[in-house]
A protein has these predicted regions:
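Short, exposed "boundary/linker" segments that immediately precede the start
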Residues: 1-6
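A nucleotide- and high-energy phosphate-metabolite-utilizing enzyme signature
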Residues: 7-184
């Protein structure tokens, strides 16, 4: 029986997208491992491919999390009044940032947003920009780390963000710039 996507509950579609990402990662990780074992890929290329795979997955995870958060709260605004689309960056540090990812590597990530801290989102359940981007960051971490039947995508380490584990999950672009200039 065929049922159009619009009839599926949102959570069912969301879970199927999470599973699809995990299958994508597993399939491509297997291809890289097989190429490595057979001698067709040198170690430097293995880390390149694994890093590119992580970047592709991060791009899709950001898109999924963005759609989910915007659907719930609306779109945040920048200081000039334009809508953020998304106005959010995932910065990779450590092995992912150095293009040195291995098969079991975690992702050292930092989240930065360009939203106006004084503005609210434009949706039915508006929240301030800082809260919106925090929820977006939490959703991204959940998508990456949640255990499903196919496992998890990656372990995530957020301790390299400004002020470490005691800092905000998502920094504004201005705060990140000040931190890099004065404290890093």
């Amino acid at each position: 029986i065929y049922t159009p996507r619009t009839l599926f509950p949102y959570t069912t579609l969301f879970r199927s997208q999470m599973e699809a990402l995990r299958h994508f990662k597993l399939a491509h990780s297997l291809r890289v491992a097989a190429s490595e074992i057979s001698g067709h890929l040198p170690l430097m290329k293995v880390s390149d491919y694994l890093t590119w795979l992580a970047e592709a997955i991060l791009e899709q995870v950001l898109a999924l999390a963005w759609r989910h958060t915007v659907a719930k709260h609306g779109t945040p605004k920048r200081s000039d009044g334009t809508l953020c689309d998304p106005g959010f960056v995932i910065v990779g540090y450590g092995k992912v940032g150095g293009i040195e990812l291995g098969h079991g590597s975690d992702l050292d990530l930092v989240f930065i947003h360009d939203g106006d801290p004084q503005a609210e989102t434009d949706g039915a359940k508006p929240i301030d920009s800082a809260q919106f981007f925090t929820r977006l960051g939490q959703r991204i971490i959940h998508l990456l780390t949640a255990q499903t039947n196919s496992g998890q995508l990656y372990e995530v380490d957020m301790r390299l963000r400004p002020s470490g584990a005691s800092g905000l999950l998502v920094s504004s672009l201005g705060a990140f710039d000040r931190y890099q200039r004065n404290e890093a």
